[in-house]
Swiss-Prot record:
This is C4-dicarboxylate transport protein. Responsible for the transport of dicarboxylates such as succinate, fumarate, and malate from the periplasm across the membrane. NCBIfam families: PRK01663.1, PRK13027.1. GO terms for cellular component: plasma membrane. Its main location: membrane. It comes from Pseudomonas fluorescens (strain Pf0-1). GO terms for molecular function: fumarate transmembrane transporter activity; malate:proton symporter activity; succinate transmembrane transporter activity. One of its GO terms (biological process) is L-aspartate transmembrane transport. It is a multi-pass membrane protein. Keywords: Cell inner membrane, Cell membrane, Membrane, Symport, Transmembrane, Transmembrane helix, Transport. It holds the Pfam family SDF. It is found in: Cell inner membrane. Belongs to the dicarboxylate/amino acid:cation symporter (DAACS) (TC 2.A.23) family.
Length: 444
């Protein structure tokens, strides 16, 4: 048994302390609180620095790493169809809830105090954007240019094309895929390093927010967080619960079955931490190896329901807080962009914030500097994101397996009825080879 990490070394605890200090500093010494704003800005710039390579590695590895494309084509098609439908529903749920509750209304954050030059650039980009221009802009002028400018949609498009081309090379392209996998490990290590600075960034961002706008602004941030948790819970029980019921099983029994994995995710804020166990458990529920091996790893990039809810709610919250007008056209544009950019997310702590930063840049209408408003509470919303993502992928695996008639329903019923008893003591590493298909180590 591993030694428990001291509380003071926990990132969760460090961020809590940093936020409390930031609130106190901003309240009692508002001028100094405003002065430490660069700490939050610097952290955001570090996050933006790795957006392009992270998305490239995740998407390319997920596509090029697929085995036996012809034999799993039907399963892959159904899986992608399910992912798109449910992800769209999740995005719409977040969009509807944040428009009804409007947690950011009344904050009246002055955008110019956040970063006037950047806001002017994004507003100009949004004003110049037509539908045709937007679609043409997805195609990069040069590959290097897409990565140099950090244009998320251009990077995503090139990554998809590169992934398919690499897959067509077969064994000849494997050295390149191996290199990308190793490069991805480096990128995710950089994420881990950057996330260690989260307390400093959260301190600077919260001190500035309270120093510039008062303690009252914290109430709105709390409303966003509570609203998000309730929305995720409702999505699991109503949307995923309804999908599960239509396919002959209970989402509550599924939650009970994967309760240990949920607890691990709750502690780590990363659904990646239970990937090997999920491969084992989904097969033991009666789904075929080929289905589990395709749906679970692919879902870690393409089926992130909790992240989808977070992205729409956070983006519109920033618009509400900064009094940035968003009409129906802007919100539809946001939805379309998120349908693409959310596929570059990964199940690691901070990935939702990374994709949010990329999305605000791609939309062009919302101030990226507004990310500073939610930096302090983003860490505390990551648990709900990760838990919702995990339940969503568990449900997706069973649903897709049933669609392609690769599910033993008798085994499913028996295992769910048992609640997973007897599995807890099994070491996941004993069965890492149970699932066939893509298990890229960098898909989080």
């Amino acid at each position: 048994m591993t030694t428990r990490q001291p509380l003071y070394k926990s990132l969760y605890f460090q961020v809590i302390v940093a936020i409390c200090i930031g609130i106190a500093l901003g309240h009692y010494y508002p001028q100094f609180g405003v002065a430490v704003k660069p700490l939050g800005d610097g952290f955001i710039k570090l996050i933006k620095m790795i957006i392009a390579p992270i998305i490239f590695c995740t998407v390319v590895s997920g596509i090029a790493g697929m085995q036996n494309m012809k034999s799993v084509g039907k399963t892959g098609g159904y899986a992608l169809l399910y992912f798109e439908i449910v992800s769209t529903i999740a995005l719409l749920v977040g969009l509807i809830v944040v428009n009804i509750v409007q947690p950011g209304n009344g904050m009246h954050i002055d955008v110019s105090t956040l970063d006037a030059s950047k806001v002017a650039t994004y507003v100009a980009q949004g004003a110049d954007q037509s539908v045709v221009g937007f679609l043409l802009n997805v195609i990069p002028t040069t590959i290097v240019g897409a990565f140099a400018t950090g244009d998320i949609l251009q990077v995503l498009m090139f990554s998809v094309i590169f992934g398919f081309a690499l897959h067509r090379l077969g064994a000849y392209g494997k050295p390149i895929l191996d290199f990308i996998d190793r490069f991805a490990h480096v990128m995710f290590n950089i994420i881990n390093m950057i996330m260690k600075l989260a307390p400093i960034g959260a301190f600077g961002a919260m001190a500035f927010t309270i120093g510039a706008y008062g303690v009252g602004s914290l109430v709105q941030l709390g409303q966003l967080m509570i609203c998000f948790y309730i929305t995720c819970l409702a999505f699991i029980l109503i949307v995923l619960g309804g999908i599960a019921r239509m396919h002959g099983f209970s989402v509550l029994k599924m939650i009970r079955y994967i309760r240990e994995e949920l607890l691990i995710v709750l502690g780590t804020s990363s659904s990646e931490s239970v990937l090997p166990r999920m491969l084992i458990k989904m097969e033991r529920l009666g789904a075929k190896k080929s289905v589990v091996g395709l749906v679970i790893p692919t879902g870690y990039s393409f089926n992130l329901d909790g992240t989808a809810i977070y992205l729409t709610m956070a983006a519109v919250f920033i618009a509400q807080a900064t009094d940035t007008h968003m009409d129906i056209t802007h919100q539809i544009t946001l939805l379309v962009v998120l349908l693409l950019s959310s596929k570059g997310a990964a199940g690691v702590t901070g990935s939702g914030f990374i994709v949010l930063a990329a999305t605000l840049s791609a939309v062009g209408h919302l101030p990226v500097a507004g990310l500073a408003l939610i930096l302090g509470i983003d860490r505390f919303m990551s648990e709900a994101r990760a838990l919702t993502n995990l339940v969503g992928n568990a449900v997706a695996t069973i649903v897709v397996a049933k669609w392609v008639k690769e599910l033993d329903t008798d085994v499913l019923d028996a295992e769910l009825a048992s609640g997973g008893r007897g599995i807890a003591d099994t070491r996941p590493e004993d069965d890492l080879g149970v699932a066939e298909g893509p298990t890229p180590s960098n898909v989080k």
